[in-house]
Amino acid sequence: MCKYGKSNLAAVASSTSSIIGAAAAAVAEAQPSASPSTSSSFLLLEVPFRHLLRLQPPPYFIAGTRRMAAQLDVTTLIAIVGFVFVFCLYLIHIIALSYSKYRLHHKVKEDSSLPGVSIIKPIVGKDNNLYENIESFFTTQYHKYELLFCFNSSDDEAVEVVKCLMKKYPKVDAKLFFGGETVGLNPKINNMMPAYRSALYPLILVSDSGIFMRSDGVLDMATTMMSHEKMALVTQTPYCKDREGFDAAFEQMYFGTSHGRIYLAGNCMDFVCSTGMSSMMKKEALDECGGISNFGGYLAEDYFFGRELANRGYKSAISSHPALQNSSSVSVSSFLDRICRWVKLRIAMLPHILLVEPLQDCFPSGLIMAFSLNHLVGLNIMPILILHTIYWFSMDYSLMNSMQNGKLSFSPLQFMLIWLLRELTAPFVFIKALLQPTIQWRNNVFHLAWGGQILPPKC
């Protein structure tokens, strides 16, 4: 056991208790009165995390920390940092699960005073579920909207699917756009430009072709958008529609656990983590940022939409209903390639992610916690690893049940097997992203500069 282990941990525990007490008091004073159902259980969830960072630690905590730092050796310092890092990951689990209970799956009331919505659907190719996905937008329960379908070519095989639905629902205002408009190196932005320029309504919903929309999904997003005058971006938490097969279950499990945890916790703590598969924006606010053409030089345009809007003082939120991805062509290998592509994007946009990305999953973080506690207080490594894994698995399973809001399409045993596969493959996906930084998306190959900007192709 480390010479200073017990005394240091006791000092940290005492000081942390005081800080938590001060934070709770400050939040209670700053939070306006709320309904009894939310004020007691979810008080902290309504306060942006950045406000908590303004709290000043007590003087004795600072003095104690300085004394500890003067006595620490490098190994002990690394162990303390490791313990704090993994403890924060434990808190992220709790925040994500609590916020999912608070924010997701609420009933939405109809409101004819809400503004109209222009729904932009960029489409490339088709799969067996495309008809079902597109039809869910033709049947959406919203009083005023238009559907704007964007194709690179009139020869795209998905064009006939859309035309068939336009004939089936002639009362729905739907238009087709072909060829796009080149405003940058991002093909999705180029594809959407004609539709964006012709949009009639003040709210823009960008929705990928693989998204199935609940009948009240657009209403839910518009209601969230108009809940605050400074709200300019509303996204749906990425999830998946129930489908048969191991590959579909693997994809659904990822979005219901690892991805869902970070997305929900990030939105709760007011971080920019927007995703573009189903996102609604105020056109006026977006035009203030230069319109979507201003983001044609970035591959992850959805993230930069959110960042620029936040920089201009606008708010963002998630809607009550998750985005239901419903592609029929998913496979484990293609999905892992997709996740690898996202890792490459994050590394290019936020280089410091290199320090965190490979350590935030279950088994790497479990090893960090086990060796940290072994060094600090002499606990055996194996029991810590077992307890850590049980906690991680239990919280992931609980979060996925919350995201699902009903019975899962697979058993707990199947969930465990899929969960293990996902956790074991995560480090290899990260290594592949480091070794092969070039991004291949559909038929295009991209090279990114630090910061996420697309580099022009080499001649």
Curated annotation (Swiss-Prot):
Motif segment (D3): 302
Keywords from the named record: Glycosyltransferase, Lipid biosynthesis, Lipid metabolism, Membrane, Sphingolipid metabolism, Transferase, Transmembrane, Transmembrane helix
Biological process terms in GO annotation: glucosylceramide biosynthetic process; nematode larval development; regulation of mesodermal cell fate specification; regulation of protein localization to basolateral plasma membrane
Motif D2, chain ranges: 208
Catalytic reaction equation(s): an N-acylsphing-4-enine + UDP-alpha-D-glucose = a beta-D-glucosyl-(1<->1')-N-acylsphing-4-enine + UDP + H(+); an N-acyl-15-methylhexadecasphing-4-enine + UDP-alpha-D-glucose = an N-acyl-1-beta-D-glucosyl-15-methylhexadecasphing-4-enine + UDP + H(+)
Catalytic activity, EC: 2.4.1.80
Subcellular location: Membrane
One of the Pfam families matching this protein, by short name: Glyco_transf_21
Presence of keyword Mitochondrion: no
Signal peptide: none
GO molecular function, one term: ceramide glucosyltransferase activity
Membrane-spanning ranges: 77-97, 367-387, 415-435
Active site: D302 (proton acceptor)
Tissues where this protein is expressed: Expressed in pharyngeal intestinal valve, intestinal rectal valve and hypodermis.
Pathway(s) of this molecule: Lipid metabolism; sphingolipid metabolism
Keyword Membrane included in the entry's annotation: yes
Predominant subcellular localization, coarse grouping: membrane
Motif (D1): 156
Coiled-coil stretches noted in the UniProt entry, renumbered to this chain: none
Membrane topology recorded in Swiss-Prot or TrEMBL: Multi-pass membrane protein
Enzyme class, UniProt record, top EC level: transferase
Residue ranges annotated as motif (Q/R)XXRW: 338-342
Entry function: Catalyzes the first glycosylation step in glycosphingolipid biosynthesis, the transfer of glucose to ceramide to produce glucosylceramides (GlcCer). GlcCer are known to contribute to the physical properties and physiological functions of membranes and may regulate signal transduction. Seems to be the major active form in the nematode. Only branched-chain sphingoid bases like 15-methylhexadecasphing-4-enine are used for generating complex sphingolipids in Caenorhabditis elegans.
Free-text domain note: The D1, D2, D3, (Q/R)XXRW motif is a critical part of the GCS active site, involved in catalysis and UDP-sugar binding.
Similarity remark: Belongs to the glycosyltransferase 2 family.
Protein name, UniProt field: Ceramide glucosyltransferase 3
Gene encoding the protein: cgt-3
